[in-house]
Amino acid sequence: VTRPNRLVNVRAEIQGRIEHLPGEKGRRVKAGDELCVLAVDSRHADLTQSQALFNKAFLEYKGVLDLSKQRLQSEINIAQAKAELETARANVKRAELALAKTRIVAPFDGVVDKQPVEVGDVLSPGTVCVSLMETNPILITGQIAEKNISAVKPGDRVRGKLVHGPEVTGTISFIGSAPEMQTRTYPVEVTTPNPKNLIRSGLSIEMFVPMAQTRAHLISSASLVLNDAGDVGVRVVDNA
């Protein structure tokens, strides 16, 4: 069965009201494209205020350093001015980050699978904006019998035939370490390119895994015989 290489719920990191939803369900997006845009509200003003306080703290710290050269400031005053400057710098970074987080963007190229919110909804930190699905490459998941598990390894090339579609090729990217207890088969994943996104998630597919070659002889069934114990043998003629 085919499934996405990644399926991620993209969540809000701050609280805010949705103003725009460019990441519509079914849309293909690139990494960095906007999925949800939250209202800026007072965040621009917060950034402007924090930048002004930083500039003030910087000038005060510079003034304290100038006076210290004339031995008119104590070490305590210098340390306090520096601490206030670093606090102001951190507040600027915090305000910039809060403003940037109003834009919820795609972490990778993919397809918007679900969009459980609407314009006007208020998101809290952790609320899902969209579910994003990566389908290039796409994964093919299946099972390998216990008797064949030693014949395959990660990196082996595999062919696959879609029930209603073309043949595809891929590479084994994962083999489970433990079998399914009921079937005694091991889970396996095959990664296959899907640049045109022609292979959808959830499709049934038949996989062909090449095994190691073994030399053998083809013997006609007419040459096979059973002994009195029921064992299969081959009747041969010794011309010596």
Task: Kindly give the residue locations of the regions a language model identified.
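Short hydrophobic/aromatic beta-strand micro-patches
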Residues: 37, 143, 189-191
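N-terminal beta-strand block that forms a small beta-sandwich/beta-barrel module immediately after a flexible targeting
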Residues: 1-15, 173, 222
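Surface-exposed patches in structured soluble domains
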Residues: 1, 17-22, 28-34, 98, ...
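A generic structural motif
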Residues: 3-6, 22, 39, 116, ...
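Structural microfeature recognizing short secondary-structure transition sites
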Residues: 113-114, 138, 162, 166-233
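Short, compositionally biased
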Residues: 45-58, 144-150, 172-180, 219-228
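Alpha-helical coiled-coil segments
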Residues: 24, 42-97, 115-118, 140, ...
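Residues that recognize and position ribonucleotide moieties
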Residues: 36, 142, 217-218, 235
